[in-house]
Amino acid sequence: VEAAGLTVDDFKDTTWSDFIEKAKKVVEKNNVPMLTSSGGSEIVIEMLQSAGASPMVDGKVDLVGNEALKKSIETYKQLIDEKIMVDYTDWDQYIASMNKGTAAGVIQGCWIMSSIQAAEEQSGNWAIVDMPKLDGIEGATNYANCGGASWAVSSNCKNTDLAFDFLKSTFGESVELYDDLLPNAGAIASYLPAAESEVYNEASDFYGGQTVYKDIVDFAGKVPGIDYGAYYSDIRSALTDAITNVVQNGADIDSEIKNAQDTVEFNINE
């Protein structure tokens, strides 16, 4: 970034069109892509969520006519076509692109941090900012998530009230627990009050003194909610096929979105 005459701040609170123009300078000066990616539809789904555009509305698939989805696929195609982003199918190559400096950045959930930090020699070279937002889409933001976890109480539980109370009083409200989990297990909470704790406010040497954990929790509180119903895997698989056809075969975006919707609806009705 610095080699291109830019700073980390130039990539904060930006739009995809602005990001792409700046990224071109980074690519030109460093001869590496600005972004590394893996999983095809993953970053498209992140873009979609950043605009709060649910792929399911009132229990029905809502891909056709979803302007945020179309804009996301168009943006993805531009990133690939202009060599601003490389998308790996091999996970090891994806991680290596970060560790070996053959990509300037990545848009991913905070769980990727442990893989980035495995390259200790890169300490001080990384920073964390919010993602670009989609241009011209109502409700677009600079925030999304990827991955996460769910807590559940089994129907076989003999004391569900106690189990629910345990989850509520620990993961649901204990800042002290999260303060212990962060340094000892590397688990980052999206529980908003955790951002006010001393542990979450500690600066990270690896990220140039940035209070990354506080920033991540702050970002998490701004992520729009979207609905996948029970069909996240079906939606993601269908979108991966659509994106592949658009990027590799020059297929029409609207037609591929229609095919994706038909595929998901077929799987739901099976």
Task: Write out the residue ranges for each language-model feature.
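C-terminal lobe and pocket-closing loops
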Residues: 112-123, 134-238
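Solvent-exposed, amphipathic alpha-helical segments
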Residues: 3, 234, 238-249
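Hydrophobic aliphatic residues
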Residues: 48-51, 94, 170
